[in-house]
Amino acid sequence: MKLILTHEVSGLGTPGDVVEVKDGYGRNFLLPRNLATPWTKGGEKQVETISKARKARAIASLDEAKAVKQSLEARTVAFAARAGRGGRLFGAVTPADVALAVSAAGGPTVDKRKVEILQPIKTTGTHKALVRLHPDVSATVTIDVVEATA
């Protein structure tokens, strides 16, 4: 099945890519979640539109991505969450929470889909998260999770 990706799918491609996948994967996973659209003759225009939008949103140059990386790695992001005894959180810190905390701390706006938490953050303390800024540049963000005061 030939599809046009509308969102980034790890291991498959980025928005605007034309991919060939098995029918079941396309019908049961990609299409229902609006991660892709079927390839049509009018798909050429859609690919161009998606790639233009992606370029407008993406960090344009490698130099700019490196500058943002230095900015992110230089700061520690504080995040307050409700916790029980022993510093165990009620829930977990999600990539969306990390993206919001980075923006609130005065950092650049980060897309939650670009934040990768390698180990679930379920306790207070210092943790690390990876932010993919550019295909060649990733920044490691230090997150300091503290107990929220009521």
Curated annotation (Swiss-Prot):
Assigned GO CC terms: ribonucleoprotein complex; ribosome
Pfam families documented for this protein: Ribosomal_L9_C (PF03948), Ribosomal_L9_N (PF01281)
PROSITE patterns listed in its UniProt record: RIBOSOMAL_L9 (PS00651)
Keyword Ribosomal protein attached: yes
GO biological process, one term: translation
Function: Binds to the 23S rRNA.
Family: Belongs to the bacterial ribosomal protein bL9 family.
Protein name in the entry: Large ribosomal subunit protein bL9
Annotated gene: rplI
